A protein has these predicted regions:
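Short beta-strand micro-motifs enriched in acidic
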Residues: 34-36, 59, 195
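Core segments of cupin and vicinal oxygen chelate
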Residues: 2-52, 90, 98-105, 109, ...
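Short amphipathic beta-strand/extended segments with alternating polar/hydrophobic composition
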Residues: 54-57, 190-194
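DNA polymerase sliding clamps and clamp-related checkpoint/processivity subunits
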Residues: 55-61, 65, 74, 78, ...
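Vicinal oxygen chelate
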Residues: 1-4, 7-16, 44-46, 62-87, 89-143, 147, ...
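Glycine-rich acetyl-CoA-binding "A-motif" of GNAT/NAT acetyltransferases
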Residues: 52, 70, 117, 188, ...
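Conserved donor-binding loop and adjoining core beta-sheet/short helix segment
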Residues: 38, 48-50, 56-68
Length: 257
């Protein structure tokens, strides 16, 4: 998997019904799924325009008993997974599991001090070039990464210190406070803000579409639910967030026709 330091390099969906998930995201985003991964788990890759941008993992009964729910998890490229995990734990976060997959890389599922889960990963090979997973305005790829949390100031400090993200801009959001955006290497990649309407802190990942209204209609026709939007954003685009038929939240980002 190609590397892009401190960037989101993969988007993984844990699903209680992978076949239904593949059908839904295929209808909404045009994705296809490919094969099974290098492990014994039922794992497939999401392809957008023929490029791998994420994975689809089946939630087994044992995983469900352990508390795993349908949802998306982003993978962030780090130089040293174990050192990053130690830093996360020292700062009040948690480590849930770590593994090394030959030919893919070392990774660990973690959560920040407020409970938002994500992965840190050191991909292999290390000279494969930039990951295509996050590619603003490229259809079907990740277009934005948004942390809904309870203390945006504390979360901002945590991610800046862990990943070296730098502040990009701040937008007022009335009662929710500031919408803080961050960049890596000069490229805007994420935002952090207080979101009291969410049941618990989580990352929400937005994928690019050509027409936000047409995409909204596809979500609804395929059995998904629109939670908010479409709403305009400073880039001139529009975004919405939604829930797939199995309960996983995601976002879409695009223009209006």
């Amino acid at each position: 998997m190609p590397a892009t330091p401190s960037q989101f390099i993969w988007y993984g969906l844990c699903s209680s019904n992978p076949a239904k998930a593949a059908e839904f995201y295929g209808a909404v985003l045009g994705w296809t799924v490919q094969g099974s991964g290098p492990t014994e788990m039922n794992y497939k890759a999401w392809l957008a325009g023929g490029e791998g941008i994420g994975g689809l993992l089946e939630i087994t009964p044992d995983m469900a008993l352990g508390g795993m729910e349908d949802g998306w998890l982003g993978y962030v490229d780090v130089e040293d997974v174990d050192a990053s995990v130690a830093t996360i734990v020292a700062k009040g976060g948690h480590s849930h599991m770590a593994q090394t997959v030959p030919g893919v890389g070392r990774m660990a599922m973690v959560s920040d001090p407020q409970g938002a889960a994500f992965y840190v990963m050191k991909p292999e090979p290390t000279d494969a070039g930039p990951s295509p997973a996050f590619a603003p305005r490229v259809l079907g790829h990740g277009g934005w990464n948004e942390l809904h949390t309870k203390d945006s100031n504390a979360a901002s400090v945590f991610y800046r210190e862990l990943l070296g993200w730098t502040s990009d801009a701040s937008y007022g959001m009335s009662a929710m406070g500031a919408y803080l955006t961050f960049n890596v290497g000069g490229d805007a990649i994420s935002a952090i803000f207080n979101s009291p309407g969410f049941p618990k802190p989580r990352w929400l990942y937005y994928f690019n579409v050509d027409d936000i209204d047409a995409a909204k209609a596809r979500v609804e026709a395929a059995g998904g639910t629109i939670n908010a939007g479409p709403m305009p954003v400073p880039t001139g685009q529009w975004m919405l967030n939604a829930t797939d038929p199995q309960g996983a939240m995601f976002g879409l980002l695009g223009d209006k026709a």
